[in-house]
Amino acid sequence: MEGAVAGVVQDIRFARSADGVQIAYAVHGSGPPLLLDSCWLSHLQHDWQSPVWRHYLVELGRVATVIRFDERGHGLSDRGVTDHSLEARVADLEAVVDDAGLERFAVLAMAQGGPVALEYAARHPERVTRLACYGSYAGAQVEATAEELELDAAFTALIKVGWDRPTPEFRRVFTYLMIPGGTEEQMRWIDDLQRTAVDADTAVVAREQRKLADSSARLPELDLPVLVLHSLGDQMNDFAQSRHLATHIRGARLVALESDNHIVLADEPAWPVLLHELVAFLEPDREALAVSIAAAQAAGSPDLATVLSPRELDVLRLAASGCDNDAIGAELVLSVRTVERHLQNAYAKLGLHGRSARAGAVARLLART
């Protein structure tokens, strides 16, 4: 499946999670891999046309290969799911990572994706190069006041009675909290996204189970570059949540954005600040990839083990033995999509392009054996 915006194409794929749930994910852009951990409301195709999200997708795709996915029960992922526990959601992220063929990558955790990304980074420190948290938190109940808990209960009641109604009055409450500074067009889009992304029953179940997700105990374990961004006037997730992250993760840097919007919009002053911080934060990964590609291009027959990941080498060895992509996938227990992605990554690192890329990569492998 494909969709397009501003001349950019996204490739929509599916990964099977540990419990069999199919998780939809999309890939677009070029550069080092950046995994966007799913937030509360998403729909890969609907978001692609969004007046609220479009600037994020376009700009991040200029500097990274962006991988994003719909949470279980939401968007293009399997619906009617009842298990929305932290453990299940971490398994979903693991499934996407494996199916996409990612070895080492940066993570951008947005909103409710925070606990999942933090847990994943703690479990797999060898795979996450850096972690950015935007409008997020470690645990939903961190420093929650009695008033906030009462408000949360009221929101759950609103979902039950108004989410699936054809008119948006009830959903508009959530829209105002997300983008109080949005235009009417942007607010209508968020109104529609709520019904498009998830039904009322799943929204309630997922919301209740999400409250139990808490990765606070993992924060002292993290040892990687961490950037924390949050709007000062955010009414969905309080700024104090990000302060908690920054004060409990060693070396984390906190950037306070001058905005009241949970999702910083393209026309407000906070947007170029947010974008600059993210691009600068990702720059070391871009530099590392550029060095790897330059080294491969400069060397006639480079030591492939220093350029390619172990999995990319495995795939290339089987290709050299005459296996097609189906056979490679069967041998390594990978989807054909994942095999293709490993090969494309190898070609890029070796500076090979076009129809002769496979033959060129195989020739370089055989030259060192």
Predicted features and spans:
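Short beta-strand/loop motif that positions the catalytic acidic residue
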Residues: 222, 228-230, 234
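Regulatory hinge/linker segments at domain boundaries
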Residues: 288-317
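Conserved hydrolase catalytic core segment
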Residues: 103-146
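Catalytic active-site module of serine/aspartate enzymes centered on a nucleophile-bearing elbow/loop
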Residues: 252-298
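Conserved acidic catalytic loop of the alpha/beta-hydrolase fold
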Residues: 87-105
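Conserved HGGG/HGGXW glycine-rich cap/lid loop of the alpha/beta-hydrolase fold
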Residues: 14-78
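Basic, Lys/Arg-enriched C-terminal extension of HTH/homeodomain DNA-binding domains
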Residues: 348-369
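Helix-rich cap/lid subdomain of alpha/beta-hydrolase
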Residues: 134-192, 200-207
